[in-house]
Amino acid sequence: MIKVRVPATSANMGPGFDSMGMAVKVYNEFAFREINNGLNFNGVPEEFCNEDNIIYKAMKYCFDKADYKIKGLNISVLNQDIPISRGLGSSSSCIVGGLVGANEILGGKFSKDELLEMAVKIEGHPDNVAPALFGGMVVAIIENNKTVYNKIEIKDKVKFITIVPDFRLSTEKARTVLPKQISRADGIYNIGRAALMISCFVTDRYDLIRSACNDALHQNYRKELIPHFDDVYNKCYELGALGCYLSGAGPTIMAIIDNGANGFSNNIKQYLKDKDIKWGVLELQADNKGAFVIKGDS
């Protein structure tokens, strides 16, 4: 049996729409085994126990690339700790987990870069799948049908308070509210802030992250789909967050705080309780490792 662990990811990071993302330490864990025939699932809701399952589709994509005809397959979801449809890369974790598992069955035929190309073909953009695969903060673009990326290790000087609403928001729905065209001014606004965001993590200038987190392309439109967004977002800054942004397509809000700052999580939890906002709060560190096969299990 092959076991694979994949981290959650937070895409866009404010201004880096569809091009920036980072991995954090909450995980989905999968197990795969080739069997004599059939397709079996464990730990998967019944409606997803078929060939349309995103994990299976990713694995089949990898097998097809290798011209490998698998006899049968057992897919198990051992742990699903990444919240679903909350802007934390749950679907990307399934894609990456399936690809890494399939590649292990193939004996490691493909490199991680090749797996990334497959993941991007399946997902459509690299901002979640790249950090899920490589860990850290990844900046990625598509150039001539090839994914060009660079990984930045996130130091332990900051941590990430993940404020998770009690409702789902699909990426498809969140994209419907975005304008089809943007102004030059908004493009310039985001280019500068995306560059600043990257430089903040490279040079440890976390005091500049608040300005770097601002966005003109998606957040102001998507927040209308999220009750209490402005109140919680503003409260994060009031409580001392270094930066705050909508994670992925939402609805999760990500607050960046100093690693030595104590009390933020309890304070935001108390605020949510006082306002009767039934959202969860996770205090997470960055994951710089990315997806990996768990060794020593059978």
From Swiss-Prot:
Top EC class for this record: transferase
What EC number(s) does the entry state?
A: 2.7.1.39
Q: Which residues bind ATP?
A: P83, I84, S85, R86, G87, L88, G89, S90, S91, S92, S93
Write down any Gene Ontology CC term. cytoplasm
Q: Which InterPro entries match?
A: GHMP_kinase_C_dom (IPR013750), GHMP_kinase_C_sf (IPR036554), GHMP_kinase_N_dom (IPR006204), GHMP_knse_ATP-bd_CS (IPR006203), Homoserine_kinase (IPR000870), Ribosomal_Su5_D2-typ_SF (IPR020568), Ribsml_uS5_D2-typ_fold_subgr (IPR014721)
Keyword RNA-binding among UniProt keywords: no
Transferase keyword on record = yes
UniProt pathway: Amino-acid biosynthesis; L-threonine biosynthesis; L-threonine from L-aspartate: step 4/5
Q: Where in the cell is it found?
A: Cytoplasm
Q: Which residues form the signal peptide?
A: none
Alphabetical list of PROSITE patterns matching this protein: GHMP_KINASES_ATP
Any one GO MF annotation of this record: homoserine kinase activity
Q: Name one Pfam family in it.
A: GHMP_kinases_C
Q: Which UniProt keywords apply?
A: Amino-acid biosynthesis, ATP-binding, Cytoplasm, Kinase, Nucleotide-binding, Threonine biosynthesis, Transferase
**TM segments?**
none
Which reaction does this enzyme catalyse, per its entry? L-homoserine + ATP = O-phospho-L-homoserine + ADP + H(+)
**A biological-process GO annotation:** threonine biosynthetic process
Role: Catalyzes the ATP-dependent phosphorylation of L-homoserine to L-homoserine phosphate.
Q: Which family does it belong to?
A: Belongs to the GHMP kinase family. Homoserine kinase subfamily.
- Xref: PANTHER family: HOMOSERINE KINASE, HOMOSERINE/4-DIPHOSPHOCYTIDYL-2-C-METHYL-D-ERYTHRITOL KINASE
Q: What is this protein called?
A: Homoserine kinase
Phylogenetic classification of the source organism: Bacteria, Bacillati, Bacillota, Clostridia, Eubacteriales
Quote the gene name from the UniProt entry.
Answer: thrB
